[in-house]
Amino acid sequence: ARRWIARLAKGDLAPHAAAADLYAGEHWSVARRFPELSLPGETVRLWACSAGYGLIPASAPVMPYHATLTPGQADSVPGNSAAWWSELSQWPGPEPSLARSIQALVAEDPGAVFLLVLSRNYLNACGPDVAAARARISDARQLMIVSAGTRPQGALADLMIPADARLQARFGGTRRALNARIGGHLLSAGIRNAAEATEHMRQLLAEQPPVPRYDRVRQSDPEILERIAKRLDHEPGASANRLLREFRDAGLACEQHRFSRLFRTLAEARP
C-alpha cells in the first residue's frame, strides 16, 4: 500500500477529474443521483470508498487508476484488503483537510445519518473502520449498511438492512448496481433510520418472487481460455468482468475467481 500511495502522490501533474465523473458503470450512474434525493432542509453528501484513494468525497480530484478491493481480479489490491484500507486512511489523500476514514467522518458529525452502500468485498475491507465508527455515532440506528446478499454477522449484524437478489425484480438493472438502487430507494422514500429501513425492506422482500435459477454449462480450463483468446483477438482492451458477463450470457458457467485467474494467465502470456 505504501508503494501505491507513493505512486499516487507523485502524480500531481497528471490529469485529474472529480471521482464521481471518473467512476463508470451502472452503480455509479445510480449513486451520482443520491444528493438529489434529499428531504427539505437536508443535505445529502456523497462519498466514495475507493480502492485506490481510500475514503474520499465524490468531488475529490483523482487520477485514473486500476485497483479493486474485490479479490481474484487482475487489478485486485495485494494482501489483506482491510489492512490496505487502513493504510490508505493514514495518507492525507487528495483532500487533506477532510476525513480519511468512516470513523473520522462519523466523529465529525455524530448526529448525522450515514448510509453505507457496499458490496460484500468492500464491506469486508471497510468492516473494522465501520465498527469503529459505530462507537462514535450518537444513535446506532442512524448508521445503516446496504450490502445485498452479505450475511449479517459480528459487530455489524444489527446495522445490516435486509436485502438480497430477490430485490432485482423490484428495482431492475443489473445485480452489480442493486445495492445502489436500494440505497436510492431508501433515500427517496425518506427513510433515515435502521429500524424503519429494516421493516420496510423485509416487507419488500416478502413481496418478491424467488430468484431465477440458470442451468449454465460448465467449461474446462482449455475451453474457457480458447473463448477468452478469441475475444481478446477481436477486442484486446476487453476486461475480465465484461468477458465473464458475456460468457454467462451465453449460457456458460464459471466462478468469477476462476475466470479472472484464467484471464490473467492468458493476458500475461500474450505479446
Question: Which residues are covered by each model-predicted region?
Answer:
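Active-site helix-to-loop segments that bind/position phosphate- or nucleotide-bearing substrates
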Residues: 1-32
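Long, charge-dense
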Residues: 52-104
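Short acidic, S/G/P-rich loop/turn micro-motifs used as interaction or catalytic elements
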Residues: 120-126
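Glycine-rich, aromatic-bearing surface loops/beta-hairpins
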Residues: 142-203
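Basic, amphipathic alpha-helix used for nucleic-acid engagement in HTH/winged-helix/SANT-Myb modules
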Residues: 186-229, 271
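Positively charged, polyanion-binding regions of nucleic-acid-associated proteins
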Residues: 217-240, 250, 262-271
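Append "Primarily bacterial transcriptional regulators
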Residues: 243
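Short helix-coil junctions and helix-kink-helix linkers
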Residues: 246-253
